């Protein structure tokens, strides 16, 4: 799907550049190295994932970070920006969150017209971290709708987490919101490799 762009050396394709744009689920996610390794093996070219992400931040913050994403000149942008919008103590209204993600997507499409943009839903929330996000699914749906309205891709990782037994899920996400990096690598990275490179690659 992505052809190797030569940089003057016949056997040295340029790296595929990815920006992961999001919250602590990206900043602390730990799944990026596995994505780099898996996608590089699949595409037979280097892959570099850079994160523009900050724990505890919302889509309001993300609006101020679009310049950083654009400056990286990525080929692909992975976006998850709903999780903290939905918290009761940092409450960004559903309408405001939807407007913010729409504005972010419009800016990225205008300024990076060749980039492939993928909006993501990450993992399920539980315990206290879930209780303070009672309408999280509505925020995911709003961000999905804004992506699809623009013809952009949406990847939902939640069903893959929910295939785990309740005990395994609790072990994988001990605080109810942040998966252990090794589990995130096993669940998120392969799904992104398949989506980016095509189902004929990977496992």
Predicted regions located by residue number:
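Serine-esterase "nucleophile elbow" of acetyl-processing enzymes
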Residues: 1-55, 65-73
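Oxyanion-hole/transition-state-stabilizing segment in secreted/luminal serine hydrolases
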Residues: 31-34, 45, 59-96, 126
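Structural recognition of the beta-strand scaffold that forms the well-ordered cores
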Residues: 17-20, 48-53, 76-81, 116-121, ...
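Solvent-exposed loop/turn segments at secondary-structure junctions
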Residues: 24-27, 54-59, 83-88, 123-127, ...
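Catalytic His-Asp segment of secreted/periplasmic serine-dependent ester chemistry enzymes
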Residues: 123-203
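Generic structural signal for well-ordered alpha-helices
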Residues: 66, 101-106, 140
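Active-site segments of SGNH/GDSL-like serine hydrolases
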Residues: 80-84, 107-139
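Solvent-exposed, acidic/flexible segments
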Residues: 24-32, 55, 59-62, 90, ...
């Amino acid at each position: 799907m992505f052809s190797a762009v030569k940089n003057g050396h016949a056997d040295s394709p340029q790296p595929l550049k990815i920006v992961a744009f999001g919250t602590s689920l990206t900043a602390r996610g730990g799944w990026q190295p596995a994505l780099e390794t898996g996608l590089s093996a699949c595409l037979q070219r280097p892959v570099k994932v850079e994160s523009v992400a900050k724990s505890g931040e919302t889509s309001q913050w993300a609006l101020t970070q679009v310049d950083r994403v654009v400056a990286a000149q990525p080929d692909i942008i992975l976006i998850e920006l709903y999780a903290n919008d939905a918290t009761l103590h940092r409450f960004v209204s559903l309408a405001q969150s939807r407007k913010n993600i729409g504005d972010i997507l419009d800016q990225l499409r205008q300024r990076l017209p060749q980039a492939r943009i993928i909006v993501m839903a990450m993992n399920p929330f539980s315990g206290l971290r879930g209780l303070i996000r009672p309408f999280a699914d509505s925020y995911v749906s709003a961000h999905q709708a804004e992506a699809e309205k623009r013809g952009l891709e949406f990847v939902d990782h939640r069903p893959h987490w929910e295939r785990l037994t309740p005990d395994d899920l609790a072990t994988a996400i001990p605080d109810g919101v942040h998966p252990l990096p090794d589990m995130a690598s096993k669940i998120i990275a392969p799904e992104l490799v398949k989506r980016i490179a095509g189902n004929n690659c990977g496992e």
